[in-house]
From Swiss-Prot:
Gene it is expressed from: ARPC2
Places the protein is found: Cytoplasm, Cytoskeleton; Cell projection; Synapse, Synaptosome; Nucleus
Modified positions (N6-acetyllysine) in chain numbering: 275, 295
Family, per entry: Belongs to the ARPC2 family.
MF terms (GO), sorted A to Z: actin binding; structural constituent of cytoskeleton
GO-annotated cellular components: actin cytoskeleton; Arp2/3 protein complex; cytosol; endosome; extracellular exosome; focal adhesion; glutamatergic synapse; lamellipodium
Subunit structure: Component of the Arp2/3 complex composed of ACTR2/ARP2, ACTR3/ARP3, ARPC1B/p41-ARC, ARPC2/p34-ARC, ARPC3/p21-ARC, ARPC4/p20-ARC and ARPC5/p16-ARC. Interacts with SHANK3; the interaction probably mediates the association of SHANK3 with the Arp2/3 complex. Interacts with DNAI3; this interaction reduces binding of the Arp2/3 complex to the VCA domain of nucleation promoting factors.
Domain of life of the organism encoding this protein: Eukaryota
Name the record gives this protein: Actin-related protein 2/3 complex subunit 2
Classification lineage: Eukaryota, Metazoa, Chordata, Craniata, Vertebrata
Length: 300
């Protein structure tokens, strides 16, 4: 299985190139790039007010207001410090870099810029991981509508943090492949006792969402992660956040890859069957042609 990259490579490569050219004393060039990411996220890299010595990186998330309620602004201020500026119009967060005043740790700064989406997501996880560490219980469940028709729920208890993703399957084939995929996760946990518990429910929401307006339907699935202190403690939580916030994309990416592989194998098998049928086809019977006098035509 393939792990999706947590960072955004376009941001990192663009910024790294700008920093490298500035450090070499090259003349700055204009940049104007708009591109999308998973979960309807939109990025914009530009020169504010046409100033080529400044590079602005902005991100738009439809659900950012929900993240703000869980401390997203404070976390971003802690991570990005003075690089965080007022967001440009149409975006939720903007970072500004001055090519005439390069930071000392350029590689670290570039990497953190590439982690912008992840760091926006991280606030809700850090908040509930902290609740669990402090033994708090009864806090309101976090509800993040991270896609138009899909939702993430996070809830903490004294001994665990429960994260539930709702997801919509496009067709019946996706449901079947998704179930097989989730079964592999259950089998994997048997081999690793430190892995979190993973549960999958189809059509009906899990018991954790019994009193909510969680969606119900034949194309609805719910993936539940039960995270214990070994997954949420200070030394492990960064890696846990990296992996879990991309899980929905990870699941659907592999469903699409599986379908593509199956279709490729089907086409290959069909081609093999056609070759067998062509070899088995009898040769056309040659008819003997004669003239009215009884002579036989012969091909030259």
């Amino acid at each position: 299985m393939i792990l999706l990259e947590v960072n955004n490579r376009i941001i990192e490569e663009t910024l790294a190139l700008k920093f490298e050219n500035a450090a070499a004393g090259n003349k700055p060039e204009a940049v104007e790039v708009t591109f999308a990411d998973f979960d309807g996220v939109l990025y914009h890299i530009s020169n504010p007010n046409g100033d080529k010595t400044k590079v602005m990186v902005s991100i738009s998330l439809k659900f950012y207001k929900e993240l703000q309620a869980h401390g997203a602004d404070e976390l971003l201020k802690r991570v990005y410090g003075s690089f965080l500026v007022n967001p440009e119009s149409g975006y939720n967060v903007s970072l500004l870099y001055d090519l005439e005043n390069l930071p000392a740790s350029k590689d670290s700064i570039v990497h953190q810029a590439g982690m912008l989406k992840r760091n926006c997501f991280a606030s809700v996880f850090e908040k509930y991981f902290q609740f669990q560490e402090e033994g708090k219980e009864g806090e309101n469940r976090a509800v993040i509508h991270y896609r138009d028709d899909e939702t993430m729920y996070v809830e903490s208890k004294k001994d665990r943090v429960t994260v539930v993703f709702s997801t919509v399957f496009k067709d019946d084939d996706d449901v079947v492949i998704g179930k097989v995929f989730m079964q592999e996760f259950k089998e994997g946990r048997r081999a690793s006792h430190t892995a979190p518990q993973v549960l999958f429910s189809h059509r009906e929401p899990p018991l954790e969402l019994k009193d909510t307006d969680a969606a119900v339907g034949d194309n609805i699935g719910y993936i539940t992660f039960v995270l214990f202190p070994r997954h949420t403690n200070a030394s492990a939580r960064d890696n846990t956040i990296n992996l879990i916030h991309t899980f929905r994309d990870y699941l659907h990416y592999h469903i699409k890859c599986s379908k593509a592989y199956i279709h490729t194998r089907m086409r290959a098998k069909t081609s093999d069957f056609l070759k067998v049928l062509n070899r088995a086809r009898p040769d056309a019977e040659k008819k003997e042609m004669k003239t009215i006098t009884g002579k036989t035509f012969s091909s030259r």
